[in-house]
Amino acid sequence: MSKTHLTEQKFSDFALHPQVVEALEKKGFYNCTPIQALALPLTLAGRDVAGQAQTGTGKTMAFLTSTFHYLLSHPAIDDRKVNQPRALIMAPTRELAVQIHADAEPLAQATGLKLGLAYGGDGYDKQLKVLESGVDILIGTTGRLIDYAKQNHINLGAIQVVVLDEADRMYDLGFIKDIRWLFRRMPPAAQRLNMLFSATLSYRVRELAFEQMNNAEYVEVEPEQKTGHRIKEELFYPSNEEKMRLLQTLIEEEWPDRAIIFANTKHRCEDIWGHLAADGHRVGLLTGDVAQKKRLRILDEFTRGDLDILVATDVAARGLHIPAVTHVFNYDLPDDCEDYVHRIGRTGRAGASGHSISLACEEYALNLPAIESYIGHSIPVSKYNPEALMNDLPKPLRLTRSRPGNGPRRAGAPRNRRRSG
């Protein structure tokens, strides 16, 4: 974490359980981020918190620290059964649930509290086997949680801590009925520590907090601008015919260490993947059609640096906690203004700088005025020389279901192609 992203407040300054502090410091966490410095005094005092902060600002560690401290400091109910978790953390996507679980593992190892993971797509029996042995903290997506609850594999009657992460995304994906179903099976709000975190605290999110929390305190960490002041934004106006060639030329020029390319449809993502894979880039594809095991493998390879480029739809734009993403390319300008912010928020995280490059083609340029109005500024425009675009490109690969989602990146230096402007 960059020091510029941290406050002077130290975790050790709080009356946190010693095992929690030890686990944090072992992972190199000494100073709090702004959202952690605001939320922890409240949760340690037993107050409910509804927090707003940009992605990448430490929200996850804020609620994990609070959850582990609370469970270590408050005994479980006397007649708690093996199928009754003590804490429930709900996430909108399986990728986010998996990442929260990974972030929680060092704390679990240090404290002895047991973790469980529940998400749809695959792994039903494997997840169930862990639950049957008893877990303290259950992390999951609402659909799989309801499946387990309806079959009495889990019982929510002993819940002491509830976390709702990416609450605005829960609404976007239509999970609000599922959330309310789960809340109705828990002890009353006054008998739990409740935490809600969201990129935006809209009216509907505040309404949910009013319904399901106990006089929650609202804490907000507002960025200087919605897109983050450490992100360099850049805009090009390519023709439809030059768009793919421009993208590949920019990639050769920028030679990003770790980049995510967003497009508006899965078919467009597959097309981009095919061009880049054929050109020798180490590229992965992440869309709703990719099988769950493969999705997790691709994310792991991208996080480890085995892949340099990830091509993704907006289904993957929220909740990806991947460090050191240097570049985000908006191959298509999104139809939803918030998606622009969420997309480019994958870079420039935790105090680092980042570069966002958007292509306003003939098909999606009409989305630009609304995006610029939403973010409160114009995106700087750059020009390019059409004659300098790459044109000796191999025929794109066509995706087959048996083909892996990456290809070897070509060895050697990037091509020496420069744009004008």
From Swiss-Prot:
Belongs to the DEAD box helicase family. RhlB subfamily. Component of the RNA degradosome, which is a multiprotein complex involved in RNA processing and mRNA degradation. CDD domains: DEADc (cd00268), SF2_C_DEAD (cd18787). Coiled coil: none annotated. It is found in: Cytoplasm. Residues 40-219 form the Helicase ATP-binding domain. It is an enzyme of class 3 (hydrolase). It comes from the Bacteria. It comes from Salmonella typhimurium (strain LT2 / SGSC1412 / ATCC 700720). Residues 402-414 have a biased composition (Low complexity). This is ATP-dependent RNA helicase RhlB. A motif (Q motif) lies at residues 9-37. A motif (DEAD box) lies at residues 165-168.
